[in-house]
Amino acid sequence: ASMFKHDHYMDNGVRYPNGDGICEQLNETKCDAGFSYDRSICEGPHYWHTISKWFIACGIGQRQSPINIVSYDAKFRQRLPKLKFKPHMEKLKTEVTNHQNRAPEFEPEDGENLYVKLNNLVDGHYKFHNLHVHNGRTRRKGSEHSVNGRFTPMEAHLVFHHDDQTHFEPTRTKLGGAFPGHNDFVVVGVFHEVGDDGFGDEPDDEECKRILKGHHPDNNENGNGDNGNNGYNGDNGNNGDNGNNGYNGDNGNNGDNGNNGYNGDNGNNGDNGNNGENGNNGENGNNGDNGNNGENGHKHGCRVKKAKHLSRILECAYRNDKVREFKKVGEEEGLDVHLTPEMALPPLKYRHYYTYEGSLTTPPCTESVLWVVQKCHVQVSRRVLHALRNVEGYKDGTTLRKYGTRRPTQKNKVTVYKSFK
């Protein structure tokens, strides 16, 4: 999660750690000083705290994000509210630009208002600030958060900032009172997987123009219900993209990914076979985190949604020259995009989540964030990941695939709560 438009670190020169692996603390006092995701230099994530006095929390903070969430250690809170937005399913006019070596951000235009609703947890005055998606140095490990040590190729962040115009002080969450002060931000994190089937052909330039203006097919991803009979009118309908029974794993018996859904990326003999990371007994297999008896299986009512509209929006945006080509601060060209932020989320009935008090994941690493990390995953087209990794983040044309845009896991002892048993 980010908040500021930073200078590009290359404009300030590059420093390297000394023989003892130590970087000198600079006297810089800018909160928008340049930083990098290159882990070999002093501008990289392990040394962000040395770049500016404003960044000191990156090195000594007690509630730094992201973290590895251990599901069985998370504490169930019965009264945690459902995650909703006001207004519901609102289509916003946003602008996205090249964000240099950071994830491109979709920011609402003036007058576009969307608020997150987490009744009894925070007040109702957290206003949508941006949507961005993180990627990694490898295709498989791109999410900033992990659950039980497992990552996904991408992680979407919906950032909400307390609206100063309301004249209310940000309310502190009632989650044990471990930290003093207020939470200025609410950030919703969503694990994004990638797939090949069910997302249609690659859109051409003319189709992208229509898509970015908000023109989509008549059928709605959330149309006649999450299990509707008409496929695309329900995320995983009986005759739809995800097979007869959908619920038997990621995509059901006759779905896109083989006989038993989530037994590997593409069925029983997927990327890691029956007993691999995604196999029958692995993270996403029958008894794993996302399998029939696991965290995302029958017992807890979770299912991976194919976010088809979002996929085409992201793919078209990341491919557009205004976003893809490197731009210095002040020279950006904004691309207008009509976007419904809820497209990035699971359907309402599957918005089970983990929550904890953490920080921004980019400098200045401000420790005033309430994180709401979705348990259920969303799937986008593999072309989205390819397009994002091909966005230029550096003056020499180096793309985001080289260093990624994910901060390494932070070793904090923070209490994580969950809205589900």
From Swiss-Prot:
Reactions catalysed according to its record: hydrogencarbonate + H(+) = CO2 + H2O
Annotated localization: Secreted, Extracellular space, Extracellular matrix
Biased composition annotated in UniProt, kind: Low complexity: 220-295
Bridged cysteine pairs (disulfide): none
Binding site for Zn(2+): H132, H134, H157
Main location: secreted
EC number: 4.2.1.1
Ranges of biased composition (kind: Basic and acidic residues): 207-219
Matches recorded under Pfam families: Carb_anhydrase (PF00194), Collagen (PF01391)
Ranges where the Alpha-carbonic anhydrase domain occurs: 33-420
Family note: Belongs to the alpha-carbonic anhydrase family.
Record-given protein name: Nacrein-like protein M
Species in which this protein is naturally found: Pinctada maxima
